[in-house]
Design a protein with these regions (language model features):
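Bacterial Sec-dependent N-terminal signal peptides
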Residues: 1-23
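Composition- and surface-driven signal marking solvent-exposed, interaction-prone regions
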Residues: 4, 116, 256-260, 302, ...
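N-terminal accessory beta-strand-rich subdomains and adjacent acidic, glycine-rich linkers
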Residues: 23-265
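Generic recognition of flexible, low-complexity loop/linker segments
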Residues: 89, 229-232, 274, 305, ...
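Catalytic cores of large soluble enzymes that bind and process phosphate-bearing ligands
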Residues: 91, 235, 278, 294-298, ...
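Long, contiguous hydrophobic alpha-helical segments, chiefly transmembrane helices and signal peptides
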Residues: 95, 99-101, 120-122, 241-246, ...
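An acidic-aromatic substrate-binding cleft motif
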Residues: 234-312, 316
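Aromatic- and carboxylate-enriched substrate-binding clefts and catalytic-loop regions
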Residues: 319-489
């Protein structure tokens, strides 16, 4: 059975159901036994009839629908009942600047999630700005723009931004990604993009990442469970929100607020004051990674960077990969532990009003016997407790390169433990933001962007656009998802 042709059905009737909103409305209909939705905005239809659906336990949920009903309440939710008695829900949220939809499947034993058929269709002549590449690195590729009809089975890293023929702007992404695998977009060669999942199986072989140069062997994470979909889940299944941002101009687009509105609120035990937590202090930083050759990681050189940051009025210095080897690389060698060297640096920086952040990989890299990583819960607790005691203010955690279920949950555990120790976090080598910085205000940024770290050396594999084009596109594409760990020079 072709799942794409058997989409989630709410009604056997082709009768549209409208949800009221000030500017954006979602209309649901079941035309020909298939669930469709459309979006109206400012008297226009930027998203004409588009399919919804999921494939769970190898069954397209849209078949054999017995009934559906709209549930009472402030938020719109539809209950869908199958003839076999199975029940699931479609939730709809509407805002002045767009819409969001998601699926909920009640707990009923283990379930395997195979695929998703949620699509967003645009009028003919729509142009799209997007980044595309191997899925581990799709978030740091160069942006390009094309007519949407020319994109056929090509991966688009969310968010992708669209300019419709009538001048309306739209952006498509996902939000509130928690305990679920992340999604990408695929072009369908038919004026639409489809939410979908990328299989992890087969992307790790002989210490290399498929499609990537051998110089990136060290980026392969060996103790991640690199699994292929379907993902098996127990308990209630709640998908992330599928978000469509809408605006009549670019100013409205960059000021879109949907992601923050659908993100879960912070845990009051971890963040009693929410986003106003006193120890969370965003700022500008310097780091030595690109410019200092073999001397870049020494304690003395970092003190020089602290002096420079203080002189320039910058808030922090990031101590990158290699600091944990200081007992082997510093002139005094093993006379001091890595923590003693680090304490010397944090004390020096504190006297000058500069914070110190430290780097660590999320897990053990292939062929690197010095890595420890943060997968083990005990190691996470010990490492972060020691960082806090040493005076470190923030962590740069690197090398995720996937958004499977394990990795998404690992990032959340890292953020929780960091919050317990009053540590700020940036994620590097990671997927796009989905509102996680609203749920965890100590997450200041995620990379998921092609910065000037990719200009040469070991990063020269990333093909480069004209930087003037790339930088002017970013505020209207990648930055719509959330703050970025971006490297300018």
């Amino acid at each position: 059975m072709n799942c794409i042709n058997n989409l989630l059905v709410i009604s056997a009737l082709a009768l549209p159901l409208m949800v009221n909103a000030q500017k954006a409305t979602v209309g649901l209909s079941a035309d020909g036994g298939k669930l469709n939705y459309k979006v109206s905005y400012n008297g226009k239809t930027p998203v004409p009839a588009s399919p919804l659906g999921m494939k769970v336990d190898n069954i397209c949920l849209g078949t054999d629908i017995a009934s559906f009903s709209k549930n009472p309440g402030a938020e719109t939710s539809y209950t869908v009942k199958r003839k076999d008695g199975a029940v699931y829900y479609v939730d709809v949220r509407e805002f002045d600047d767009g819409v969001a939809l998601r699926y909920r499947i009640p707990a009923d034993g283990p379930k395997c999630i195979y695929s998703e058929q949620t699509a967003v269709t645009f009028p003919e002549g729509t142009r799209v700005w997007y980044a595309s590449g191997p899925f581990q690195y799709g978030w740091i590729q160069a942006y390009q723009d094309r007519d949407i009809s020319k994109i056929d089975n090509e991966l688009l890293a969310p968010p992708a931004t669209f300019l419709l023929p009538d001048g309306t702007y739209a952006a498509v992404t996902e939000a509130n990604l928690r305990n679920f695998h992340g999604a990408v977009l695929f072009g369908n060669n038919d004026n639409s993009v489809n939410f979908g999942y990328v299989e992890n199986k087969g992307h790790v072989e002989s210490g290399t990442i498929t499609g990537m140069p051998g110089s990136h062997v060290h980026d392969v994470v060996r103790d991640y469970p690199w699994i292929a979909y379907p993902d098996e889940k127990t308990g209630e299944i709640v998908t992330p929100w599928r978000v469509i941002m809408l605006a009549s101009d670019l100013d409205g687009l960059v000021n879109n607020t949907i992601i923050g509105k659908v993100a879960d609120a912070p845990d009051p035990e971890l963040f009693p004051n929410g986003k106003d937590t006193e120890w969370i202090k965003p700022g500008r930083s310097v780091f030595t990674w690109l410019t200092e050759g073999n001397n870049r990681l020494s304690v003395a050189n970092h003190k020089r960077y602290v002096d420079g940051a203080a002189e320039l009025g910058l808030q922090s210095v990031v101590v990158d990969d290699g600091w944990e080897l200081w007992p082997q690389t510093e002139p005094e060698g093993s006379a001091h532990t890595k923590w003693e060297y680090l304490k010397d640096l944090t004390d020096y920086a504190a006297q000058r009003g500069v914070d110190i952040w430290v780097w660590r990989p999320s897990s053990v890299r292939a062929g690197n016997k010095t890595d420890i990583g943060l997968v083990d819960a005990g190691e996470r607790r010990q490492f972060m407790k020691k960082c806090a005691e040493t005076g470190v203010k923030g962590l740069k955690i690197d090398f995720f390169h996937t958004e499977n279920l394990f990795t998404v949950n690992l990032m959340e555990e890292i953020l929780k433990e960091a919050a317990r120790n009053k540590l700020m976090v940036i994620f590097h080598g990671v997927n796009k933001p989905t509102g996680d910085n609203f749920t965890y205000p100590n997450l200041l940024a995620k990379e998921a962007v092609r910065g000037l770290e990719c200009v040469g050396g070991e990063n020269s594999w990333a093909p480069g656009p004209a930087w003037t084009y790339h930088n002017t596109v970013l505020p209207f594409t990648r930055w719509l998802a959330g703050p970025a760990d971006y490297t300018p020079l």
